[in-house]
A protein has these predicted regions:
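Mature, soluble, non-transmembrane domains
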Residues: 62-129
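N-terminal secretory signal peptides
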Residues: 6-56
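Membrane-interface motif at the C-terminal end of an N-terminal transmembrane signal
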Residues: 1-4
Length: 129
C-alpha cells in the first residue's frame, strides 16, 4: 500500500510513500488565525487513513475548545495540548499549502516542506493507493 500526495486540481502526484498498516504521518502548520503551531497526526489502519490526534501549542480562535464524546485532552512533554480519540476515517486528507507559513509533512523519519515540494497555495491531498 502507498500513501500518495497529489494536487487535487491537476492530479499530479508529488510523492508516494510506502504506507503499511501502522504508518503514522503528520502535517504541521502555523494556524492562520491564532498564529500558533498545530500538528495533525494520522495513522494508516486496515487500509484506511484515521485521524489519530491533533497537537496544539495554544488555545485561541479557530482551534478546538471543547471535546466531542470519546475525545481526550492530554499534554505532551513540551506542554502542548494533545486532543485524541477522534476515530475519524478520511478517504483523503486535504490541505491548501500555506501562502505565509509552510505546511510540513513528517513521514517515516523524513521531514518535507510542502511549500518547497508543491508550491504556495497548492491544493493537495493524501490518499492511499
Amino acid at each position: 500500500r502507498r500513501l500518495e500526495l497529489y494536487n487535487t486540481e491537476t492530479g499530479k502526484i508529488y510523492r508516494s510513500f510506502s504506507a503499511p498498516d501502522g504508518t503514522e504521518f503528520s502535517v504541521g502548520f502555523i494556524h492562520s488565525v491564532n498564529l500558533s503551531p498545530v500538528t495533525d497526526v494520522f495513522v494508516v489502519r486496515n487500509g484506511k487513513i484515521y485521524a489519530d490526534r491533533t497537537v496544539y501549542a495554544a488555545f485561541g480562535a479557530g482551534v478546538e475548545s471543547t471535546l466531542a464524546p470519546g475525545e481526550t485532552l492530554s499534554y505532551d512533554e513540551n506542554g502542548n495540548m494533545v486532543v485524541s480519540g477522534f476515530g475519524t476515517v478520511f478517504p483523503e486528507v486535504k490541505y491548501i499549502v500555506g501562502t505565509v507559513y509552510d505546511h510540513v509533512l513528517v513521514i517515516r523519519g523524513e521531514t518535507i516542506s510542502l511549500t518547497a515540494l508543491c508550491g504556495r497555495n497548492a491544493h493537495v491531498a493524501f490518499r492511499l493507493a
